[in-house]
């Protein structure tokens, strides 16, 4: 989902409302700030991906397997979403941010060091994938939102920080530089898909 704003106070009410439409354990989620929405006046937008099966002429639920490594943070408000979920042979991670380990206070780590935040955040994404018995070489896609001045140098530095956590060939990357992320203290959000 996307929300118009750049503070926890702007994120929380809309996120809490969206969460009422999902039961725990809900699919992994990502919520990032945006700076313009269409139509004008909109304050949130939701995108969703869904997987169902078709068997004997009927629409069927696909069994899910979820993981939440102990080190990975929790939201500062109650949410039904899981941090990682496997459906068939695909592992989806929720959007990871540089929050304190195993906490739900919404406090950022490595404040003022965007590259350290990128590496730290990728550590969470890697932990989730590894909880399913997979490695960084199983990534099929990483989607990275990050605060940036939009320069090539800033993008290359960000990709370098991500590459250092992968330890091999990079998967396909979707890079979304933004003038500002969630707050001045949180400069990155990353989610991924892995073969599982």
Where are these regions (language model features)?
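N-terminal presequence-like segments and the immediate start of the first folded domain
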Residues: 4-140, 146-196
